Amino acid sequence: MKETNNQAFIDGQNLYMNTRASGWTVDLVKFRIYLREKYGAQKAYYFLGAVSEENQGLYELVQTAGFILVFREHSRAMIGKKKGNVDTDIVFTIMSKVIDDKDMKDVILVSGDGDYFKMVKYLIEKKRFCKLLAPNRHSTSSLYRVFTPRYVGFLNDKDTKKKISLAV
């Protein structure tokens, strides 16, 4: 792909849980290269839940692979009591960048969660959406079936999986 200023936004828990459920693991270094080369993602934001001491190794791995880590804000009382739930943070960040970052071209979203449907539809209508990359076909929200393959892809498709899978 020619040089663009697309930006990727990854729902880290959705990516991890849905590839793991399918029996494979994403190599984050390969994945970051794939996003840059295939979709022109100059920046890639990796959203996770609250910061946890036990996940320091993961955080280093994500950053070393070239992702920008974004954590969910929680009050001290809520930490450890619920899932990451980064959906609202991702939507807010994407829409803020679409409005405020005049250099950003299009959005790449990595998630199969239907909570993003209205935003994806809106961004497609406004010609600001590149691709939804769902971790796997089987756990992707049925809402996305209305979009053509131009806008929706699956990371567990044979060719893509081969490019980004962690060698076992």
What name fits each language-model region?
Residues 1-168:
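Terminal and domain-boundary accessory regions
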